[in-house]
Amino acid sequence: MTQLAIGKPAPLGAHYDGQGVNFTLFSAHAERVELCVFDANGQEHRYDLPGNSGDIWHGYLPDARPGLRYGYRVHGPWQPAEGHRFNPAKLLIDPCARQIDGEFKDNPLLHAGHNEPDYRDNAAIAPKCVVVVDHYDWEDDAPPRTPWGSTIIYEAHVKGLTYLHPEIPVEIRGTYKALGHPVMINYLKQLGITALELLPVAQFASEPRLQRMGLSNYWGYNPVAMFALHPAYACSPETALDEFRDAIKALHKAGIEVILDIVLNHSAELDLDGPLFSLRGIDNRSYYWIREDGDYHNWTGCGNTLNLSHPAVVDYASACLRYWVETCHVDGFRFDLAAVMGRTPEFRQDAPLFTAIQNCPVLSQVKLIAEPWDIAPSGYQVGNFPPLFAEWNDHFRDAARRFWLHYDLPLGAFAGRFAASSDVFKRNGRLPSAAINLVTAHDGFTLRDCVCFNHKHNEANGEENRDGTNNNYSNNHGKEGLGGTLDLVERRRDSIHALLTTLLLSQGTPMLLAGDEHGHSQHGNNNAYCQDNQLNWLDWSQASSGLTAFTAALIHLRKRIPALVENRWWEEGDGNVRWLNRYAQPLSTDEWQNGPKQLQILLSDRFLIAINATLEVTEIVLPAGEWHAIPPFAGEDNPVITVVWQGPAHGLCVFQR
């Protein structure tokens, strides 16, 4: 091969122009950067990057072609106390690589050293980057752009969603292709889903600790190459990108948006005892928040924290997000531990990354959802994100569970959460849709487990049941575990129905965990991040068709209620909502705070949710008018006109007049 030309400092990464490849890499503290390319026999050829524009190192390799494997060796000081951990004996992944060849195994050679550098060369076993060329025909693809007020989110794992689906061809189950299969798309449409939110699909690695226990990181919240698709979800790693885009194109044609769960808060390099894959060896001091002693600020619980206030790291994160939108046509992002995005190190609404997103004509137009906390001091930031963001509403999750399963929440607190938690989100011009309401999510109990287990059962995770939250607000209804008498099963079913109704008929944006609509259980494991098995894979052969139909009917009912889809805050006397007691009268102040758990919620003057969350059957006097129960609480043609509803214990019903 010929020597490198100077090349250009932008864009970041490796880019083929038809004649060769331009390579760029950011490092503010490097003294020298070597591009290492590998031929078909694995022979390494090294080239110094000749260009240095500010903190960007760059070079152009004529005649290089797509498929070329490469990596970097970055030279600089080994000064751990200062936060510098350069080690040119270690081959490093390009942070902007579009494809990775090789596996991130637990191997001592993939560690740089803790206090002293490890100068053993690791090129023979280190994963390599691959130069790719992008030619994809999107045809007439267009984003659905579903209004927030009409959005129904379905949180799912690429593999777990389809791996056991009997109607999807065996050879594509658990893959990107399966997401776009007609069987899957028809199911989502019939259920009423408008947005498929996928757990991380950017390439991730399993922590060495898990590998030593024979486990793996199933969820994917351990990123190593943020521009590359995780190859294990592809039928062929070489075609992963096109398989993913084919699925997105098919989902878009069905009117379904795709939202990616993305991890910009930490990397798979973990703490100082963790592996050296990329950022630590490229510019540790710039990419991470570093303490005065040279160690990491661990505001994520994962060993390190990305410094998203550093200009170069902001550019990196912004470029990553734009890549997924522009190259893959995704419709939005859910940001894991998103408080890190606003750290300066204090949390600020005008933090550099927030400002960059707001000013970007691409990113400011997609759906943005924050998990609004991290584990740093003042890490809980629910309600404090910039107006462009919606946020996971854990207030709603806990309130719904406490009201229906612990019976210890006053009516006033329940109503506040039902009304999109306006005390939290009604500020800075935000709309009710800013509250992403959920009862369950990938972390925590499934909905079925909420009514079957009082305690977590995480022994399979190998941490002696210490991991996972103890604050589950669950209720096993008298027996720990699945199964039981008919009476027990029916009481659990009623609780599931109550929780689903609360979720899907509340103001705000509902998010449904995949599998909750057909009774999926993780057998009490509330932190199944490392379980690549039947605990996480949805067993469609055991799905409860009745529960699925109930859920679908609720979603379709929601779409008929103007007070829920118009995405306007409810105001006194606007006709959107009236709160009534069991006698169809406005609740008194005392009833709101101390009254029995009986409530009628009149929406849009036509739809009535009658609630009896007490231990006894109770007569509920409905407001004036001819009321009849509607699906999923009655048949399609229900001639019964009801004046008084005999509300069963812990029951609810929806009527229309």
Curated annotation (Swiss-Prot):
<dbReference type="Pfam" id="PF02922">
    <property type="entry name" value="CBM_48"/>
</dbReference>
<dbReference type="Pfam" id="PF18390">
    <property type="entry name" value="GlgX_C"/>
</dbReference>
<feature type="active site" description="Proton donor">
    <location>
        <position position="371"/>
    </location>
</feature>
<keyword id="KW-0321">Glycogen metabolism</keyword>
<dbReference type="InterPro" id="IPR013783">
    <property type="entry name" value="Ig-like_fold"/>
</dbReference>
<dbReference type="InterPro" id="IPR011837">
    <property type="entry name" value="Glycogen_debranch_GlgX"/>
</dbReference>
<dbReference type="InterPro" id="IPR044505">
    <property type="entry name" value="GlgX_Isoamylase_N_E_set"/>
</dbReference>
<keyword id="KW-0119">Carbohydrate metabolism</keyword>
<dbReference type="InterPro" id="IPR006047">
    <property type="entry name" value="Glyco_hydro_13_cat_dom"/>
</dbReference>
<keyword id="KW-0378">Hydrolase</keyword>
<dbReference type="InterPro" id="IPR040784">
    <property type="entry name" value="GlgX_C"/>
</dbReference>
<protein>
    <recommendedName>
        <fullName>Glycogen debranching enzyme</fullName>
        <ecNumber>3.2.1.196</ecNumber>
    </recommendedName>
</protein>
<comment type="pathway">
    <text>Glycan degradation; glycogen degradation.</text>
</comment>
<feature type="site" description="Transition state stabilizer">
    <location>
        <position position="443"/>
    </location>
</feature>
<dbReference type="InterPro" id="IPR017853">
    <property type="entry name" value="Glycoside_hydrolase_SF"/>
</dbReference>
<dbReference type="InterPro" id="IPR022844">
    <property type="entry name" value="Glycogen_debranch_bac"/>
</dbReference>
<dbReference type="InterPro" id="IPR004193">
    <property type="entry name" value="Glyco_hydro_13_N"/>
</dbReference>
<comment type="function">
    <text>Removes maltotriose and maltotetraose chains that are attached by 1,6-alpha-linkage to the limit dextrin main chain, generating a debranched limit dextrin.</text>
</comment>
<comment type="similarity">
    <text>Belongs to the glycosyl hydrolase 13 family.</text>
</comment>
<feature type="region of interest" description="Disordered">
    <location>
        <begin position="460"/>
        <end position="479"/>
    </location>
</feature>
<dbReference type="Pfam" id="PF00128">
    <property type="entry name" value="Alpha-amylase"/>
</dbReference>
<dbReference type="InterPro" id="IPR013780">
    <property type="entry name" value="Glyco_hydro_b"/>
</dbReference>
<keyword id="KW-0326">Glycosidase</keyword>
<dbReference type="GO" id="GO:0005980">
    <property type="term" value="P:glycogen catabolic process"/>
</dbReference>
<dbReference type="GO" id="GO:0004553">
    <property type="term" value="F:hydrolase activity, hydrolyzing O-glycosyl compounds"/>
</dbReference>
<dbReference type="InterPro" id="IPR014756">
    <property type="entry name" value="Ig_E-set"/>
</dbReference>
<feature type="active site" description="Nucleophile">
    <location>
        <position position="336"/>
    </location>
</feature>
<dbReference type="GO" id="GO:0004133">
    <property type="term" value="F:glycogen debranching enzyme activity"/>
</dbReference>
